[in-house]
Each structure stands twice: as structure tokens, then as C-alpha cells.
């Protein structure tokens, strides 16, 4: 493959490969480009109005073979064989089923072996592949960028546009490189990396950019870890996040249901290797982190950028120079019920949630099981362990992880978005505090008045055992049997 005259970033390559028509005009007045979409993921919350629009215009779905749906946001994680109790949630799920049947779209409903969170089932089925454009009516579609795909969340009107045309008008983006080099210390995970990145650049630092995560620490991560990082690109304000595909990517995809096979596989891998950013390509912005200086990270406030190392303390708003940030910190501390100067390890929780499209994969559950093995959840702590898909659930049970969770006193649930967001029965009560492996700690995100601390799976498990924000290093050794 001949090198272009101007070196390009990976994101620029994927964009260029999918332009159906270039926008007319110059500068701010230029029209959007028309981009072809390779994979469209659908769920019950953002799709009903889109299907209604098709129906009113008497339009079919242009490429139902490139569209796949699942039920995730509103589904209960217990008693899934019974009718959904909440009428709004039940209506949304039933509507998705009718729409998929009418328009010929493949659906994985509750109880199906492949049902789960939309951003977990795409990769596990091999639907998400390097060099693709992927969209979904969900902000955390950026997860799929871990495969070298350009993956973006879209709104309901855009969902309708993709269903009708398999294209989307989009404006070109700026590019950002987040370089994380060096060796991660023991106990530091992908979740800690991305929380540290967001704390460094802020929740608006990536606005208008596609972030490419680079460096030796990123390359050392598993695909699960890379998905965690790309998943939270949106919390940094970015349009999308990406990691260049490599042998780790290819081994994850090999043999999956929708991955190429035989000669097609060999040709695909050869093409995927060409996606890496060209030597000499320039990014609009570059950020650098030293992996060796990272440690377990937790949030203290009400946005993902309000975070500190677990070894740190709740910051004092009076020491924040920017007036807007100071006021935001004061408001956050009032909502969170925290005092400046409080050691993060002294913050007690009521609930621990393990799951979500950020950390609901089998690797995450193995980490939690390793911490809980031979230990008990602290008295008064409720711990929910929610697999991100039914396939993850089955794998965990085949490895005996469910018994470790249950024996420790945790609740082992069915697949779904669960306590990540207050759209289903798994919610916090007002004033309850949760250590959560999810991606957002906004006011009321996990239930009205609920208080959320974003953490890694390892920190979540250790917190469940001690009852306060903790890492596995804080736990006493398990007695030998």
C-alpha cells in the first residue's frame, strides 16, 4: 500500500476511507461530509422515534444486515422471566421488539444467549472490527474504538438517518494523541489510566477531537482494558477514542462468530495493519502521561474529571484558582456530603457496583473474584456484580466465579446496564454512596440523590471488603487453608 504524500493519523485514514461525498464550501461554512456507516447498533431507549420516522415516511431500513439490536438499558437483572414491572421500561422493550420484527432487524432480547450491553456484545460477536465506522444512539459507542474503529454516539434523528441511508453527515474532527509510556505499577489498571487522563485534561479537554491512545502502557493492555479506556473518551469531551490494532486485537477477534476466516482473515489482518498512524503524522493536540507515576484513582465529585489518587484527599475548593471550577467543586462537595481534606480511604460506602459497558467484561469479573476469594463483603454493604452480557455470565459461571461472588456475600445478577444509570430497578436511594465501576458520577446518575465514586474493578472489590474506598493492597492476607 503506497504511502500518501501527507502522513495521516489512524482516524484520518478511517474517515477518508468512508467518505461518500465531500461537503461543499470552505472553513466554518463548509457542509458536512457524508460518511458511510459499517455497523449500526440499536437499543430500546433511543430508537423508538427513529423507527416511527421511517414508518411515517414509508421507508425501509436500508441495510438491516449491518444493524443489530439488543435490550440493555431498561432491563431488570433479576426475574427476567417475568414481565418488566415499570410501564415505561416495559413499553420501550416491547416497542423495540415490534420494530425489529417489522423492519427485519436482528435482535437479542432478554434471556437470549447473546443478549447484553450493546457495547459488549458487538466486540464479543466479532461484529466490531478495525477500520470500521460504528454508530449507536448511545454516547459510549466510543468503546469500539479500542479495535481501531471510528465509533461515535449519535442522536435519535441521526439513528433514523442511518437506518434509512446507512450514511451520516458529519463534520471533520480534530485529532489528539494521549501518550502513556512506561510500565504500569502493580495494581494499576486501564480504569485508573483513563480517570487520570480525564483529571488531567478535564471533561472538556477532548472537545471536538478524536483521541488516539498510544504508548507502551496502552500497547500492554488487553482488549478489555483498551475498551475501558476508549469507553470513557466521552467523559473527556471527545467525539471518539481509538487504539491502533495489533496482534492483541487480532487474537481477540480470531474465531469469533462474525470475524473473517481463511484467506479473508489473512487479507483482513494485512489491511488492518495499515491503519496505524503514519510516521510523521501530526496531531492537533498531544498529551503525555508517565505510566510509572500512576496509581489507583477514584473520583470525589460529580463529574469524572473530579478525581484524585486513592492515596489522596478530597481537595479544598478554596485552593482552586479558576472561579468556575471552584464553584463547581463547592457544589459537588455539598451534593456528595464530603469535607475538604478527608482522606479518600476514609470515605465509607453503602453500595458497590461492578458492571457496565466500562467494566462488565470477563477480565473485570476475574479481577473482582481474585480479590473476593476467601473474603467477605463487609457488614452493611450491598454489592452487585452484573455481567455485561449473557455470554460473559456463562463464562464466569463456567469458571466458578459466581460461587466466589455469592460466597463472599455479593449479589450475582443477569446481564444489563443495571446500576450504571437510573433507568431500571437497580438504583441507589437518596444519600446512599456507591463505589462504581461505571463511567459517570453525575448527580442522580445511579438514582435520585445517589452519590457515586468511579473506581476500577480491583478498588471496587477491596472497597466491598473494607467498607471504605480501598485497594487490594489495603486488605489483610487471606489465611491459608
UniProtKB/Swiss-Prot annotation:
Compositionally biased residues, Polar residues: 429-441
Cofactor(s) it depends on: [4Fe-4S] cluster
Keywords recorded for this protein, A-Z: 4Fe-4S, Amino-acid biosynthesis, Branched-chain amino acid biosynthesis, Iron, Iron-sulfur, Leucine biosynthesis, Lyase, Metal-binding
Pfam families named in the record: Aconitase
Keyword check for Lyase: yes
Catalytic activity: (2R,3S)-3-isopropylmalate = (2S)-2-isopropylmalate
Comment on bound cofactor: Binds 1 [4Fe-4S] cluster per subunit.
Enzyme class, spelled out: lyase
EC number: 4.2.1.33
Gene3D superfamilies: Aconitase, domain 3
Transmembrane residue ranges: none
Domain of life: Bacteria
Keyword hit for 4Fe-4S: yes
PANTHER family reported in the protein's UniProt record: 3-ISOPROPYLMALATE DEHYDRATASE, HOMOACONITASE, MITOCHONDRIAL-RELATED
Subunit record text: Heterodimer of LeuC and LeuD.
Sequence similarity: Belongs to the aconitase/IPM isomerase family. LeuC type 1 subfamily.
NCBIfam families assigned to the protein according to its UniProt record, in alphabetical order: leuC, PRK05478.1, PRK12466.1
Protein name stated in the entry: 3-isopropylmalate dehydratase large subunit
Lineage: Bacteria, Bacillati, Actinomycetota, Actinomycetes, Mycobacteriales
